Amino acid sequence: MGPLLVWHRGDLRLHDHPALLEALARGPVVGLVVLDPNNLKTTPRRRAWFLENVRALREAYRARGGALWVLEGLPWEKVPEAARRLKAKAVYALTSYTPYGRYRDAKVQEALPVPLHLLPAPHLLPPDLPRAYRVYTPFARRFLGVEAPLPAPEALPKGPEEGEIPREDPGLPLPEPGEEAALAGLRAFLEAKLPRYAEERDRLDGEGGSRLSPYFALGVLSPRLAAWEAERRGGEGARKWVAELLWRDFSYHLLYHFPWMAERPLDPRFQALPWQEDEALFRAWYEGRTGVPLVDAAMRELHATGFLSNRARMNAAQFAVKHLLLPWKRCEEAFRHLLLDGDRAVNLQGWQWAGGLGVDAAPYFRVFNPVLQGERHDPEGRWLKRWAPEYPSYAPKDPVVDLEEARRRYLRLARDLARG
């Protein structure tokens, strides 16, 4: 019989990988990545970021003496094909909790000539907790501490290599791909920024945060390892940052238990908001031409870099939903495809939270003032000057809507729906 296949999906790394270590304990392994067309229907920047991290994973296999197969096609065709060609005894992978991941894995299992072993992915809290939580705080109370992460293997058995990894022009500069770069970025954040994270995490320029989200999105960096290292250092910054990592797991938990939240609000009452199918208004928001400085700076930075701070994301999303009443699902999807860290579960949670559509205890009647938000979280205006230099301050300039009138309109509509 041949080797064991380790199928990498949203876990493009060797460290803290239970499926890889379990397979290695049972025999020689060959790694596998399938370039799934269902996941590659996105922007060039996101395809390029994914492909460069697959390339880095192959180099990590090679550096340890191992081999990574890369096949292009549907997983329920290509995983069985790889298993047959290698005469593999079994396939090992980490559990996926997304609706598509569960569908894909069921189809692969049905088509495979050998067993598919799915091991728990190293989340801080498993997304498939039996009780379905809609509010973050009781979910987070289930967290009792971080389990120790697993080490990366020092060596891998030799094996055949198969498949080419295509190149894609991202159209913008990418971060350094691969887990070595991710681990270096983690160390730099823990040493330089974690001590002040609690005070600086809301900066609009994102310089108070880790900027590790593109690595988390592809599983290049294990959140369990990141939380473990943060907790070792301790302090209020570590506590706050681990809480943010728990929000990621809460996002997966929500989508696991409420898969329909990808199509409609978690609170169904707000589906009936009079969404504005206004193409000119959508383009103004999407392209950063609203006349509202914070929103315009946010969308321009996102287009130029593929990154945006959490505070800027919340403001851009809430403005689209509450001030403009743009169809939230269209905006969420367009926004996600610009993000290098575009993660469906995380982005859906973020948009439904910011939009007051039923996630967590965020009240629908909370409406950010983008002028005050800018002045509070970019007090010297440096971020604004970089991304929207035509604005001398955070005061609107010929805005597409009057901020106060739009706020009152939304509150009137939302209150009527909330009262039933």
UniProtKB/Swiss-Prot annotation:
Annotated positions binding FAD? Y197, G209, S210, R211, L212, S213, D341, G342, D343
A Gene Ontology molecular-function term? deoxyribodipyrimidine photo-lyase activity
Region Interaction with DNA, residue ranges: 244-251, 310-311
Pfam families associated with the record: DNA_photolyase, FAD_binding_7
Concerning Gene3D superfamilies, the annotation shows: 1.25.40.80, DNA Cyclobutane Dipyrimidine Photolyase, subunit A, domain 3, HUPs
S-S bonds: none
Where DNA is bound, by residue?
R201, Q373
Where does the record place the site Electron transfer via tryptophanyl radical? W275, W328, W351
Cofactor annotation comment: Binds 1 FAD per subunit.
Q: Which UniProt keywords apply?
A: Chromophore, DNA damage, DNA repair, DNA-binding, FAD, Flavoprotein, Lyase, Nucleotide-binding, Plasmid
Q: Which reactions fall under this protein's catalytic activity? A: cyclobutadipyrimidine (in DNA) = 2 pyrimidine residues (in DNA)
Concerning InterPro entries, the annotation shows: Crypto/Photolyase_FAD-like_sf, Crypto/Photolyase_N_sf, Cryptochr/Photolyase_FAD-bd, Cryptochrome/DNA_photolyase_1, DNA_photolyase_1_CS_C, DNA_photolyase_N, Rossmann-like_a/b/a_fold
What are its E.C. numbers?
4.1.99.3
Asked if the Swiss-Prot or TrEMBL record annotates the protein with the keyword ATP-binding, the reply is: no
Using the record's annotation, list all stretches that form the Photolyase/cryptochrome alpha/beta domain.
2-124
Q: Which cofactor does it need?
A: FAD
Record's compositionally biased regions (Basic and acidic residues): 159-170
The annotated subunit structure for this chain is: Monomer.
Task: Briefly state the protein's biological role.
Answer: Involved in repair of UV radiation-induced DNA damage. Catalyzes the light-dependent monomerization (300-600 nm) of cyclobutyl pyrimidine dimers (in cis-syn configuration), which are formed between adjacent bases on the same DNA strand upon exposure to ultraviolet radiation.
Instruction: Give the family, as the similarity comment puts it.
Output: Belongs to the DNA photolyase class-1 family.
Q: What is this protein called?
A: Deoxyribodipyrimidine photo-lyase
Q: Organism source for this protein?
A: Thermus thermophilus (strain ATCC BAA-163 / DSM 7039 / HB27)
